[in-house]
Amino acid sequence: MKEMIIWPAYIDLKRTKNEGRKVPKEFAVQNPKLKDIAGKLKKMGLEYSIEHKKSYPKDPWEICGYIKVKADKRTSKLQILKEICKNMG
């Protein structure tokens, strides 16, 4: 297993790639929330923990939190992000 960090900015439609979005626009969602991301991870059967009082490094003034996910070593972060985005928004 490996751990990875998922910030809401990674799947946020209003962000550009330079601002931190990691998925293509066609997968991105409007205003992703930690609870929605956590709900998708739970449905996917992945183990996770939520860190609420953390700020995204590119926006240090905005406290948005992140999710730490435990995933199989063969699963990429992009695969997980795309799966989270399905049927969201």
From Swiss-Prot:
Subcellular locations according to the entry: Cytoplasm
Q: Which Pfam families match?
A: SRP19
Subunit info?
Answer: Part of the signal recognition particle protein translocation system, which is composed of SRP and FtsY. Archaeal SRP consists of a 7S RNA molecule of 300 nucleotides and two protein subunits: SRP54 and SRP19.
Name of this protein: Signal recognition particle 19 kDa protein
UniProt record, GO biological process: SRP-dependent cotranslational protein targeting to membrane, signal sequence recognition
Q: Which family does it belong to?
A: Belongs to the SRP19 family.
Q: What terms describe the molecular function in GO for this protein?
A: 7S RNA binding
* HAMAP family in the cross-refs: SRP19 (MF_00305)
Chief site of localization: cytoplasm
What this chain does, per the entry, is described as:
Involved in targeting and insertion of nascent membrane proteins into the cytoplasmic membrane. Binds directly to 7S RNA and mediates binding of the 54 kDa subunit of the SRP.
Q: Which InterPro entries match?
A: Signal_recog_particle_SRP19, SRP19-like_sf, SRP19_arc-type
Which UniProt keywords are present, listed alphabetically?
Answer: Cytoplasm, Ribonucleoprotein, RNA-binding, Signal recognition particle
Instruction: Indicate whether Ribonucleoprotein appears among the record's keywords.
Output: yes
Presence of keyword Transferase: no
**A cellular component annotation (GO) from this entry:** signal recognition particle
